[in-house]
Amino acid sequence: MAYLPQHIGNVLQEAAINKTALTKGMIVRMRYKRLDGKSKEYWVLILQPRWRGPTDENYLIHALNLDALPIAEFFRLVEETGVIGSKSLWKDRRLDVEKLQLDMSSRRFYNSNLKDAKVLGSAYRTYLFKNVASVRVCDYNFGTSVEDFGIED
């Protein structure tokens, strides 16, 4: 089932950013050139913005595809992790954008939240960093039930 329309309804505003400015926890809309050469737009939650393993040639973006992520599961994840303001975006661009607080390492987050969760695991994707053409960070309405833990990256 496609969950993207539900998520798009919660986006308050967007702003273009450089892909090198991506950080964990951001919700972004990105234009991505797939391996078949076709370009497509994806809305994702960034888990690891630029990762390269010891045998990898290219950097990878690890993310959750919002189109495959039910909004109830997304808000459960938000409740578990918390929300913070993005200090770097405020400092550089004066953008007041909140993101998920992903304090732990990407491996620990994957093992504790995604590995055994069928719904979250099915939304997990990797994207080649070099194939990302454009990025727009989204200010997502997390609602009033989530506590804001302050502004820090």
What are these regions (language model features)?
Residues 30-34, 49-52, 67-70, 74:
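Short regulatory "switch" loops immediately downstream of catalytic or recognition motifs
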Residues 37-53:
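Short beta-strand-centered aromatic/proline hotspots
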Residues 52-66:
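Short, solvent-exposed secondary-structure boundary/capping segments
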Residues 1-23:
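Mixed-charge, Lys/Arg-rich low-complexity intrinsically disordered regions
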